[in-house]
UniProtKB/Swiss-Prot annotation:
The chain crosses the membrane at residues 1-21, 24-44, 51-71, 83-103, 112-132, 145-165, 186-206, 216-236, 262-282, 291-311, 323-343, 353-373. Disulfide bonds: none annotated. This is Na(+)/H(+) antiporter. It holds the Pfam family Na_H_Exchanger. Coiled coil: none annotated. InterPro entries: Cation/H_exchanger_TM, K/H_exchanger, Na+/solute_symporter_sf. Signal peptide: none annotated. One of its GO terms (biological process) is proton transmembrane transport. Keywords: Antiport, Cell membrane, Ion transport, Membrane, Sodium, Sodium transport, Transmembrane, Transmembrane helix, Transport. GO terms for molecular function: antiporter activity; sodium ion transmembrane transporter activity. It is found in: Cell membrane. PANTHER family: NAPA-TYPE SODIUM/HYDROGEN ANTIPORTER, SODIUM ION_PROTON EXCHANGER (EUROFUNG). It is a multi-pass membrane protein.
Length: 383
């Protein structure tokens, strides 16, 4: 029953936090992240990241990306996939190189410095999606490019991570050799094509004929969670599966019914827990000891994604402000970077001495990113 009380506290606190944030013209997600900092070990210490909080937050981020997929215009995603490729590629090369360079400057072991760069290369677009949704700019060329780039980014980061682990430690994120892992992922994306084209429309049509309460919503959640599970199984982020599940269901005539119901479910319970869980990981006990390292690496984390995304978008003839908006949308690190950090620690590539400071770097860049994204979005869409 203890978790029920914790959940109640989180829901009340995030509602108040969102309200206060919006009153001051700040994205609501900032209020929810700060609630996590306040309630966690860095603040009052009332809530700790336990298994149930983790599971609820995982469902929250999956539902958030499912909603982003439902809201996305497939034709726009196809149209801006090419600029998304440029943005993702440069958004990985810049952080990996400058993350490694920063590690070398602080006299970190070479393998560990390389892993710093890989951690900074991971983008967690779920928080950016929340800002895009709040400002109603998901279905714009910038929003579609950010979403397309995040998909490519996730695939490339997984490949870089797999290769780096194999090269640096002789291990991998999967038990399979890299060529077989790539083949698995290729088949997964082939299955996504089949899902969008035929499977999802058939399943949603079947659900309409089932005499059971909320059969349509249940079927959509089965598709969402099933695709997330399969993505996780082959070494991709579960949010990639959720995003494409949303796109698949968005091609059916029950799209709006599914969106309204899943949005109510997600924002009532699971999504606030996800944003709070990010804030719960903050621990300021190591902050004063390594403040220079934390501040410089945070600056590197922000600038490399912003500039990499900017140059990638400029290659595709975006205006300067639009390109900066795309770059800003790629800054957030979130859960993907934390997962890579954990893998690095378990593989003895990240020393405990640097673990907490790196968590703080990831969380600081995640906290700052919505403000930067909102600023550049307002410059592009002033009205």
């Amino acid at each position: 029953m203890e978790f029920i009380g914790i959940l109640c506290l989180i829901l009340v606190a995030t509602t108040i936090g969102s309200h206060i944030s919006r009153r001051f013209g700040i994205p609501a997600v900032i209020g929810q992240l700060l609630v996590g900092v306040l309630l966690g070990q860095a603040g009052l210490g009332w809530v700790h990241p336990n298994i149930l909080v983790h599971d609820f937050s995982e469902i929250g981020v999956i539902l958030l990306m499912f909603l982003a997929g439902l809201e996305s215009d497939l034709s726009l995603l196809k149209k801006y996939f090419k600029p998304g490729m440029f943005v993702a590629l440069l958004g990985i090369l810049f952080p990996v190189f400058f993350g490694w360079l920063t590690g070398e400057a602080f006299q970190v072991a070479n393998n560990e410095a390389i892993f710093f760069g890989i951690i900074l290369a991971a983008t967690s677009v779920s928080i950016s999606v929340e800002v895009l949704k709040e400002l109603n700019v998901v279905n714009t060329k910038e929003g579609s490019t950010i979403l397309g780039a995040s998909v490519v980014d996730d695939i490339l980061v997984v490949l870089v991570l797999s290769f780096s682990l194999s090269f640096l430690t002789g291990k991998s994120t999967s038990n399979l050799p890299l060529p077989l892992l790539l083949l698995e992922q290729l088949f997964y994306f082939l299955f996504i094509f089949l899902l969008v084209k035929w499977i999802a429309p058939f399943l949603m049509s079947l659900a309409e004929k089932i005499y059971a309460n909320s059969a349509i919503i249940i079927m959509s959640l089965v598709i969402c969670l099933g695709m997330s599970y399969l993505a996780d199984l082959i070494g991709l982020s579960s949010v990639i599966g959720a995003f494409f599940a949303g796109i698949a269901v968005s091609q059916t005539k029950v799209k709006h019914e599914v969106y309204n119901n899943v949005e109510a479910l997600g924002y009532a319970v699971f999504i606030p827990v996800f944003f709070v869980s990010v804030g719960l990981e903050v621990d300021f006990s190591k902050f004063s000891e390594q403040i220079l390292f934390i501040l410089i690496l945070t600056l590197v984390a922000i600038l490399t994604k912003l500039i990499g995304g900017y140059i990638g978008a400029k290659f595709s003839s975006f205006s300067s402000n639009s390109a900066l908006m795309v770059g800003a949308g790629m800054i957030s690190r979130g859960e993907m970077a934390l997962i890579i950090l954990q893998i690095g620690q378990q593989s003895n590539l990240i020393e405990n001495h640097y673990y907490s400071p790196l968590v703080i770097v990831v969380l600081l860049s995640t906290l700052i990113s919505p403000l930067i994204l909102k600023y550049f979005t307002k410059k592009v869409y002033a009205n």
